[in-house]
Amino acid sequence: MTLRLQNTLTGKKDDFIPLDPNRITLYVCGPTVYNFVHIGNARPVVVFDVLYRLLQRLYPNVVYARNITDIDDKIIKAAADNGEAISTLTERFTQAFADDMASLNAKTPSIIPKATDHIPEMIQMIAILVEKGHAYEADGQVLFAVESMPDYGKLSGRKLEDMLAGARVEVADYKRHPGDFILWKPSTDEQPGWDSPWGRGRPGWHIECSAMIHKHLGDVIDIHGGGQDLIFPHHENEIAQGCCAHGTDYVRYWLHNGYINIDGEKMSKSLGNFRLVRDLLTQYHGETLRFALLSSHYRSPLNFSADVLDNAEKGLDTLYYALLGRGETVAPEAGYQLPDNHPVLDALKDDLNTSEAVSALHAIAGELNKAELDDKPKLKAELLAAADLLGLLTVEPTAWFQNKNVSEDGLSNDAIDALVEERTQAKKDKNFARADEIRQQLTKAGIQLEDTREGTRWSR
């Protein structure tokens, strides 16, 4: 099956045809490091980590860059409020971000470029845009002239005259068009700044990604990812800068993940309804958070709640219990390779359908639970290899069930619930042999079942 991705630029699911099959290029917008990241910031990291893993499975060389924005007005304000140096603040929160994402089992990208390490490249790119007539100086600033690009707005599908409503666009008298955006801004003596042909100043937000992509990945790249909220103006402006500076296309496939909602509202710092990743990690294992983020399609909104997290933990308990087995010691088959037509691979090749991939994991776990002893090594290896594409099942099963309310046989409450649900379904399917097997298994573990009209109750 061919890898197919929903391309925001074309508005449809496109076959992925790389520029160079021997060097796949992927760029994802990273954090602005002035605070700890919330779970909404983590969603694109986890989503595109799955894409990175999939691309590594399909191609010999994948170059993945995810930037760090370490110069921004929010950073300047936060450092001033805290009474600390900007570099101290950004280094602290850069490390905190790395630690949090490691807890979610996100792979480290090939390249992690920092904005402040690329000021010369930004200045050079701005100079090219000025020279080509796509940018101009005004009121001490350098701005991109959106009217100089005939197809400006092609990513968001907005017309120039309509795109200001509801967008993060500053309207000012010194602009030729209200949609013109800042490439370079002046700095006061108290603010960080760098010397440039337009005076001492600092870059605008949008130019950072374009300059870093050009340096590390090239004029045109395969895939650019980020949150849905970045489509306009950030990614629209990236396209304008990249295309106009280099006279080429910029990105061939644009991918955007959906919002995370809390109680039906988009989670955001402005609404005060955000949940920090590190706070959630005090209550849940990082793999539980990851599983929850992958429980729905990446382009769909995800209503984040305690129920979603509890269901994620139960789902993982079911998978880990299949690996744990029933007391037998079974090692995964050595050297197992996931076949190219495996259901998990096929699901991910279909625009990263992680929910379908997770369902396929549960199907393997179900087979593993029913398998004869001789068949278990291969099934266990298959489950681990398939889960690795999703960044899941990285903990030893016995360790997973530690620090939970578990029976002497290693069964947590959630694992027991999962087995009871499986037994109920087996009875509905008239698979009475499996239903009896589960009852016997739970009885051996000291769990008593009581079938009632309301359902099955269990007790230790």
UniProtKB/Swiss-Prot annotation:
It comes from Alcanivorax borkumensis (strain ATCC 700651 / DSM 11573 / NCIMB 13689 / SK2). Zn(2+) binds at C29, C209, H234, E238. CDD domains: CysRS_core (cd00672). InterPro entries: Cys-tRNA-ligase, Cys-tRNA-synt_Ia_DALR, Cys-tRNA/MSH_ligase, CysS_C, Rossmann-like_a/b/a_fold, tRNA-synt_1_cat_dom, tRNAsynth_Ia_anticodon-bd. Disulfide bonds: none annotated. ATP binds at K269. Belongs to the class-I aminoacyl-tRNA synthetase family. This is Cysteine--tRNA ligase. Gene3D superfamilies: Cysteine-tRNA ligase, C-terminal anti-codon recognition domain (1.20.120.1910), HUPs (3.40.50.620).
